[in-house]
Amino acid sequence: MAYVLTETAAGYALLKAADKKIHKSSSLVEDLNTAEKVAEQFKIHRFEKFQSAANALEEANAIIEGKVSENLQKLLEDAKSDKKATLIVSEAKLGNAINKLGLNFQVVSDAASLDLQRAIKQFLPELLPGLDDSALKQMSLGLAHSMGRHKLKFSADKVDTMIIQAIALLDDLDKELNTYAMRCKEWYGWHFPELAKMITDSAAYARIILTMGVRSNASETDLSEILPEEVEEQVKAAAEVSMGTEITEDDLNNIKALAEQIVDFAAYREQLSNYLSSRMKAIAPNLTAMVGELVGARLIAHAGSLTSLAKAPASTVQILGAEKALFRALKTKHDTPKYGIIYHASLVGQASGKNKGRIARTLAAKAAVSLRYDCFDEERDESDDFGLENRAKVEGRLSQLEGRDMRTTSKVVREQPKVEITEARAYNADADSTAAAAAAAPTADSDDEESETEEVEEKKSKKDKKKDKKEKKDKKKDKKRKRDDDKEDKESSKKSKKDKKEKKEKKEKKAKKEKK
């Protein structure tokens, strides 16, 4: 007895084959080219209909993942008999899952079974009574759309895919623009080499080439729209005494074509940058307020989605982008990296070298909170007040570490100090003291301050001593490692020399024997 399990958009169909060895005969499968032959060979045994479109989507996803759903298990348990039967399925993963259930089926899933399934699905409406071709097509189309939406995980509110693609394209554009600009400067530099030293902006350089052409036209060309007045005068003066070679009209046309590409790329890059900035402010305004548009977009792109990044802890956000360095450090038992992509944030850049790690940790912690607010708060608007509030806290911490005011956020966002209203008290005349008594009284405040400074100095000295000890230990370890390596090299060289000597002696002995 042989059964064929066919999955449709309407439900599961279990077909009984007239020939139990049909999957082994390639000629029988090839003969199934008409509806009559298929109907003659297969009869409907059981049909498990899906309850709704959502149920159909669940069942389809279960088949793709190679899982047996409750409906399918129920269908197979009802169909099993005392004798062992053959069950032909289309998916190998599904076949393995059915085998694990321990039902009385010999599951088959090979190339011949795929051809059999193809023939059955071609004439499926003839095998299923009450289900016409148009209805089945409509169901299949609806299921395909549902599966597409499920796979894409599309959400109108959180379109972070746009950010991921935009930042990737922006990076590619930067690389292309740099390559084109370098090629253009080298090419036009043969004619006017002094221009590249005066004009560093690639887009402005390309626009000058398009406006001026050959350097002999510099004195007659108006470059006021491209350059400031002082730089324009320098360019015109340099053009008169330039050491470059002459170029033909054909050369100039090709250089101009490249310059046009650079100008177009620069304009599109600016447009794309503005688009990315607007998308970031719409999707993750608080993260943008904390780390900026580009760093925020790179973090989202590296994590894969805004949700994945929001679920990550602050420590992961801190070292995101430095995975290679992290695993290398863990492998070699060295210090792990302090920052990844977040290093390029403006707040980390403002910190001095010794405080960069601390600020990166603080910024990552506040950025993680802002991310969760952006991602999971259902009633939030597109304002960045929460992010600005957190940024003010990070700036306060930075000012504390650096020892100077480094706050840049507006005073409105900063936390206002609480004003406590106390009861009015009568003047206490007994608390008055004379100058002599004041001079005689010990200065407790100054003593406290001195003790505090001494404690701080002691802590610093202890830290410095620990650091020195650690450095000495590391140096000793490195020296020992070098000694061991040198020793191994010497031993290996001695061994190789010894082996060569033995081989030479053997050859000489062999040669002597042959002579004798």
Swiss-Prot record:
Entry keywords, A to Z: Nucleus, Ribonucleoprotein, Ribosome biogenesis, rRNA processing
PROSITE patterns: NOP (PS51358)
Gene Ontology CC terms, in alphabetical order: box C/D methylation guide snoRNP complex; nucleolus; small-subunit processome
Molecular-function annotations in GO: snoRNA binding; snRNA binding
BP GO annotations: box C/D sno(s)RNA 3'-end processing; endonucleolytic cleavage in 5'-ETS of tricistronic rRNA transcript (SSU-rRNA, 5.8S rRNA, LSU-rRNA); endonucleolytic cleavage in ITS1 to separate SSU-rRNA from 5.8S rRNA and LSU-rRNA from tricistronic rRNA transcript (SSU-rRNA, 5.8S rRNA, LSU-rRNA); endonucleolytic cleavage to generate mature 5'-end of SSU-rRNA from (SSU-rRNA, 5.8S rRNA, LSU-rRNA); filamentous growth; protein localization to nucleolus; snoRNA guided rRNA 2'-O-methylation
Subcellular location: Nucleus, Nucleolus
Extent of Basic and acidic residues compositional bias: 483-494
Principal location class: nucleus
Transmembrane segments: none
Residue span of region Disordered: 423-516
Cystine bridges: none
Compositional bias ranges of the Low complexity kind: 429-444
Residue stretches of biased makeup (Basic residues): 462-482, 495-516
Record's compositionally biased regions (Acidic residues): 445-456
Gene3D superfamilies in the record: 1.10.287.4070, Nop domain
SMART domains (UniProt xref): NOSIC
Pfam families: Nop (PF01798), NOP5NT (PF08156)
Coiled-coil ranges per UniProt: none
Alphabetical list of InterPro entries matching this protein: Nop56/Nop58, NOP58/56_N, Nop_C, Nop_dom, Nop_dom_sf, NOSIC
Domain Nop, residue spans: 283-403
Annotated function: Required for pre-18S rRNA processing. May bind microtubules.
Family: Belongs to the NOP5/NOP56 family.
Record-given protein name: Nucleolar protein 58
Source organism per UniProt: Candida albicans (strain SC5314 / ATCC MYA-2876)
Lineage: Eukaryota, Fungi, Dikarya, Ascomycota, Saccharomycotina
Gene name for this UniProt entry: NOP58
